[in-house]
């Protein structure tokens, strides 16, 4: 009987193994490309970070990425989110990594899993848990036994989770590549010989995990074998792998840029982004990933920096809420379709490059069956008229023309035929003003007068070491006794604090002295305010506030946070200055604020504390206050936002779930923006910035899954700086207007994102000019009324498609042979 059971079990295991092998995918590489089941592939990937959206959003985001022409989704794995306390793991909700990978698989796409576990990503502390920093003798990202043990433990856990669910391609899953470490080549020189030894250890450790697919290391020249090195940046056309047997791969094509509090809004044109992609494939690239394809939202306190905003929109092809960012999404989709059609020549063809002069080159990829060509003009100012294979081509400055058959131009990166969608905020049907209740941050007086804390230490301690990043807030409290005989005593005294707190609030004897906010990245500063002291005991309470922990740079984990001192009382007696250093005094430390500790934002806890919420005398501009209001969820399925204009700084919760930090009172500089953006020339994060002199972030994403469709919802605010909640409003995000520019002999497609096209505001066929919202007819017009033509085709429809031709819009002899274009603006 036992033998029979053994034989049946053995047969079952053999069948399972055979089934797994039959469905497995062999992923490898050669010098040209990643190979899948022995075939070289063009792979088009996009970054979607699972914790920066909700699990309900994942299918739609992935579907839109697929519709946009991607075949691969890339994500980091966020260590501090999954292991907030040592050996205590969280893979629930939007941290359900397995579910995310399976959602990718269900869509028929591949996945790239960047385990790191250092991620940078403008994520708090670069993805490292702060408890790791607080372990004895700890140093990150170098030969350090404690760090290496913890890194290997987490990496192994993630790998085993993927293996248990058969998610690697070698098991029949979607994961075709995995990444160990991240951009270490940018900092390796700071670590000396130990840096080289560490990266070798990373490679050996990763390779020992036997995942059955290749490992990559981004920004890692001369990566240890068998790791594949890759490129990150705005452009990687000039990149060449150090290892001649490695393919040319681009793991981060930055589609825009992130925002800092106090910073302007970044914008990278569709023309320039498409140019960077086409140039990369023209010069031999075969794998390209958009960072980000969907940026999303830094919910809760996950934003890093310091000073990274709650919005992580990144000007990506899918905006923060999951809408198509047009024309970027559509312009890239057209390019992706062509690149996929050219896959065989690009991966197997012989390559020849022809210099056509004045920074223009033609590249021919040729097989026996097919040839495909690119004509690239990297001149940032001059258009080019070139003759190639006996035909003339007009190639605008800073653009690439794509010729799938080496004869007819099918696409040019500078000629955008895709619509531009103007996203607007639509007011909801709710009453304009919410009915608020409020309460102060209770027992604050106990803290600032008595110095009652959680920890007592002699001297000043770094904020990370005390809080373990459990809170943005840490009280530093001490007492000092003064009498008339004290040498420092005078009528003119001040408090001087050398600080690395991102925001500092100071109290002396229960009185608020003032605050200091870091501006222009000057995180090491001196705070000094005049104070009124008394004979006897004086109480000092300093509230240090962090706004995201540093996430990048060599040894960034040891960068100071909080009040590092010295802290001094300064007495001025005529020309004489006398200082009393309090840095080595006994200090009391209190982690967090009482409202946070009692979870006033929680739906379970908020109504059960002994202090009631008040409905009377709603205060404005009151520091350290809590506000709460009920509201109904906006109707429909459009994304929901909350307008926090009028508030100062703090955190906001919807039904107990944090949607992030807010700071609408922090405006960007009045300088550095441009009214018109020239796509030509190299892009940088400051180029084409807009929204100068405006709040860095005014609107905050409220995921639909956070809301109750029926009944009441609750918004809770903690206001740190003082603001007016009466101006807070909920709105939905909709496509308000759509514009399009299309060259003759192309098609124009218009869509209002599931809303009907209601009217044609402008249409002209000929030589119109201007930008969306300010189009103007030119000197040459088609014979037919373009507005009527477009209205007949489009009004009342969710979308419409038209051929742009003289036959459709009428010819006009006055236009001559000059190229004609159609400009259209419709209302939704």
Swiss-Prot record:
Reactions the enzyme catalyzes: Hydrolysis of terminal non-reducing beta-D-galactose residues in beta-D-galactosides
GO CC annotations, alphabetized: apoplast
Listed PROSITE patterns: GLYCOSYL_HYDROL_F35, SUEL_LECTIN
Enzyme Commission identifier(s): 3.2.1.23
Any GO BP: carbohydrate metabolic process
Active-site residues per Swiss-Prot or TrEMBL entry: 183 (proton donor), 252 (nucleophile)
A molecular function GO annotation: beta-galactosidase activity
Subcellular location: Secreted, Extracellular space, Apoplast
Top enzyme class: hydrolase
Ranges where the SUEL-type lectin domain occurs: 742-828
InterPro entries with a match to the protein in the record: BetaGal_gal-bd, Galactose-bd-like_sf, GHD, Gly_Hdrlase_35_cat, Glyco_hydro_35_CS, Glycoside_Hdrlase_35, Glycoside_hydrolase_SF, Lectin_gal-bd_dom
Recorded family membership: Belongs to the glycosyl hydrolase 35 family.
Entry protein name: Beta-galactosidase
Organism of origin: Brassica oleracea (Wild cabbage)
């Amino acid at each position: 009987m036992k033998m029979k059971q053994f034989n049946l079990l053995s047969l079952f295991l053999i069948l399972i193994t055979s089934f797994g092998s039959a469905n497995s995918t062999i992923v490898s590489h050669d010098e040209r490309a990643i190979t899948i089941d022995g075939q070289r592939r063009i792979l088009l990937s996009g970054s979607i970070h699972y914790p920066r959206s909700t699990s309900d959003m994942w299918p739609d985001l992935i579907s839109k990425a697929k519709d946009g022409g991607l075949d691969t989704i890339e994500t980091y794995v966020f260590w501090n989110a999954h292991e907030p306390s040592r050996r205590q793991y969280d893979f629930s909700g939007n941290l359900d990594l397995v579910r995310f990978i399976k959602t990718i698989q269900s869509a028929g796409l591949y996945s790239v899993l960047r385990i790191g576990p250092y991620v940078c990503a403008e994520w708090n502390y670069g993805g490292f848990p702060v408890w790791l920093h607080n372990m004895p003798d700890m140093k990150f990202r170098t030969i350090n036994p404690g760090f290496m043990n913890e890194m290997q433990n987490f990496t192994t856990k993630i790998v085993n989770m993927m293996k248990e669910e058969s998610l690697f391609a070698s098991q029949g899953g979607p994961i075709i590549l995995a990444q160990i470490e991240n951009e270490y080549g940018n900092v390796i020189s700071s670590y000396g010989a130990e840096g080289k030894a560490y990266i070798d250890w990373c490679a050996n450790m990763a390779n020992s995990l036997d995942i059955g697919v290749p490992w990559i290391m981004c920004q890692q020249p001369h990566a240890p074998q068998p790791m594949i090195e890759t490129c990150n940046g705005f452009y990687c056309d000039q990149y060449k792998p150090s290892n001649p047997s490695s393919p040319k791969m681009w793991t981060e094509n930055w589609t825009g840029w992130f925002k800092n509090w106090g910073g302007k809004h970044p914008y990278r044109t569709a023309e320039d982004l498409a140019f960077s992609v086409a140039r990369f494939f023209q010069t031999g690239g075969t794998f390209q990933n958009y960072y980000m394809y969907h940026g999303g939202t830094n919910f809760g306190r996950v934003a890093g920096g310091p000073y990274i905003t709650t919005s992580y929109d990144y000007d990506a092809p899918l905006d923060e809420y999951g809408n198509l960012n047009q024309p970027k999404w559509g312009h890239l989709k057209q390019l992706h379709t062509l690149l996929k059609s050219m896959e065989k020549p690009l991966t197997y063809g012989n390559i020849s490059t022809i210099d056509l002069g004045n920074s223009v080159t033609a590249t021919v990829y040729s097989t026996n069956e097919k040839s495909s060509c690119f004509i690239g003009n990297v001149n940032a100012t001059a258009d080019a008229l070139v003759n190639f294979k006996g035909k003339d081509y007009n190639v605008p400055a800073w653009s690439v023309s794509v010729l799938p058959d080496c004869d007819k131009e099918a696409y040019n990166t500078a000629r955008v035929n895709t619509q531009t969608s103007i996203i607007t905020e639509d007011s909801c049907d709710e009453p304009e003003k919410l009915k608020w209740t409020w309460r102060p941050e209770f027992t604050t007086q106990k803290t600032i007068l008595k110095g009652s804390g959680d920890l007592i230490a002699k001297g000043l301690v770094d904020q990370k070491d005390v809080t373990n990043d459990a809170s943005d807030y840490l009280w530093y409290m001490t007492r000092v006794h003064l009498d008339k005989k004290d040498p420092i005593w005078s009528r003119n005294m001040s408090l001087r604090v050398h600080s690395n707190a991102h925001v500092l609030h100071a109290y002396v004897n229960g009185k608020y002295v003032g605050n200091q906010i870091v501006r222009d990245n000057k995180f090491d500063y001196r705070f000094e305010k005049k104070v009124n002291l008394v004979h006897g005991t004086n109480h000092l309470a300093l509230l240090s506030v962090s706004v995201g922990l540093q996430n990048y740079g060599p040894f960034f984990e040891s960068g100071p946070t909080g009040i590092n001192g010295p802290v001094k009382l300064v007495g001025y007696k005529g020309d004489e200055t006398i200082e009393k250093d309090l840095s080595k005094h006994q200090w009391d430390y209190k982690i967090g604020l009482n409202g946070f500790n009692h979870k006033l934002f929680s739906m379970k806890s908020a109504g059960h504390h002994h202090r009631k919420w008040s409905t009377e005398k709603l205060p404005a501009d009151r520091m350290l206050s809590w506000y709460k209001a009920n509201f109904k969820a906006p109707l429909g399925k459009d994304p929901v936002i909350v307008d926090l204009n009028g508030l100062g700084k703090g955190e906001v919760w919807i039904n107990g779930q944090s949607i992030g930090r807010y700071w609408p009172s922090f405006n960007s500089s009045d300088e550095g923006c441009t009214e018109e953006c020239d796509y030509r020339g190299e892009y940088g994060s400051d180029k084409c910035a807009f929204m100068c002199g405006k709040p860095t972030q005014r609107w905050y994403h409220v995921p639909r899954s956070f809301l109750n469709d029926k009944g009441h919802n609750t918004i809770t605010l903690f206001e740190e700086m003082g603001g007016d909640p009466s101006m807070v409003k909920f709105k939905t995000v909709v496509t308000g207007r759509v514009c399009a520019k299309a060259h003759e002999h192309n098609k124009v497609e218009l869509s209002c994102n599931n809303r009907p096209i209601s009217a044609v505001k402008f249409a002209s066929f000929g030589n119109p000019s201007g930008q969306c919202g300010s189009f103007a007819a030119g000197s040459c017009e088609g014979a037919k009324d373009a507005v009527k033509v477009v209205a007949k085709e489009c009004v009342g429809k969710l979308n419409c498609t038209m051929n742009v031709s003289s036959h459709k819009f009428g010819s006009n002899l006055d236009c001559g042979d000059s190229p004609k274009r159609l400009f259209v603006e419709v209302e939704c």
